[in-house]
């Protein structure tokens, strides 16, 4: 049995763009708690690449490199999420010498 989405339960479900709980409890300025939709003009409501309801610009580092083999990840300007953690390609030496 599949139940319909419920706005106000803190879970983003099918048809919702955000869900910050009941209107009296909502602390998210980007989300309309009554409709579970982003407020007009908002691109996002949460994520490493979301700031003040807008996507951070392309090139903003969202995950710095942690080792010589790691590659720093940057926001794309098109998503609230930081891209998948990536590493240098196989065959490239990254030992600490």
Swiss-Prot record:
Glycans are attached at residue 32. Expressed by the venom gland. Its cofactor is Zn(2+). Residues 4-90 form the Disintegrin domain. GO terms for biological process: proteolysis. Binds 1 zinc ion per subunit. Monomer. This is Zinc metalloproteinase-disintegrin-like bothrojarin-4.
